[in-house]
Structure formats: C-alpha cells, structure tokens
Amino acid sequence: VLSASDKTNVKGVFAKVGGSAEAYGAETLERMFTAYPQTKTYFPHFDLHHGSAQIKAHGKKVAAALVEAANHIDDIAGALSKLSDLHAQKLRVDPVNFKLLGHCFLVVVAIHHPTLLTPEVHASLDKFMCAVAKELTAKYR
C-alpha cells in the first residue's frame, strides 16, 4: 500500500522525468531486453536494436502507462484496467516480466537522476512499480 509520503515521492519522480518519459521508456525496454533476454519472446516482430523505431514507439506506450498510473495514483487499477485486460487476455505476457520492467525503470531513473533517487524515494518508486505490476496481472487470475 502506498503511503501519502510514497505518493508524494512518486509524483515528484514523474515531475522530474517529465519530458524525457518517452526516452526513458525506450531505454527501459532496451535494458530489459538486454539484461533479461527471455523477455524478447513477446516481441518477435520487433527490431530490438538500440534506437529502433519499434522500441521507441513501444517505450512511448510504456511511459504513457506509467505516467497515467502516477497521475491516477489513488486508482491505479482504474487507470490500467484496459491495459490489464490486453495483457491478460490477448498478449498473455508472463507476469514476472512486469517486475523486470519495473526494475529496469528504476535503473534508468537512477542513472539520469542519481540525486533524486534517495533511499526513501527508491523505496516509494519500487512500491509504485510493484503496484503497477500487480494491477497489470490482476486479471490473470
């Protein structure tokens, strides 16, 4: 459960990420595909090379979903409901991949904003990413 402090911390991160969200989304995917090659299996039709237009486009979607969740932090389930349906019913992505994506997003934020990611903010952002992963897999059951 996200505390009031967690919510403030998460909103602060997304305020800083701001205009770079799309680039961070693409970088997050590139890191995930490199560090966890098994995640590539869901993207057999993608050009997975650095700077690929497909990774950039999907990174934009990932970033938009995270921003949407942060903007509706009191109703993450509602904000991600359609995306949860898509991943559970059509795409059938292994739920562990959302945790891997969350970890890679934390790394990207840490690289670009090292002073922002204090231990407290890190914990809050990790809890937020876990909440996002939980909602994206909620309809698998």
From Swiss-Prot:
Alphabetical UniProt keywords: Heme, Iron, Metal-binding, Oxygen transport, Transport
A GO term for molecular function: haptoglobin binding
Residues noted as binding heme b in the record, renumbered to the chain: 87
GO cellular component: blood microparticle; haptoglobin-hemoglobin complex; hemoglobin complex
Pfam family, one: Globin
Any GO BP annotation: hydrogen peroxide catabolic process
Boundaries of every Globin domain copy: 1-141
Binding site for O2: 58
SUPFAM superfamilies in alphabetical order: Globin-like (SSF46458)
Entry comment describing in which tissues the protein is expressed: Red blood cells.
Subunit structure as annotated in this protein's UniProt entry: Heterotetramer of two alpha chains and two beta chains.
Family: Belongs to the globin family.
PANTHER family: HEMOGLOBIN FAMILY MEMBER, HEMOGLOBIN SUBUNIT ALPHA
Function: Involved in oxygen transport from the lung to the various peripheral tissues.
Name under which the protein is recorded: Hemoglobin subunit alpha-A
The species this protein was found in: Phalacrocorax carbo (Great cormorant)
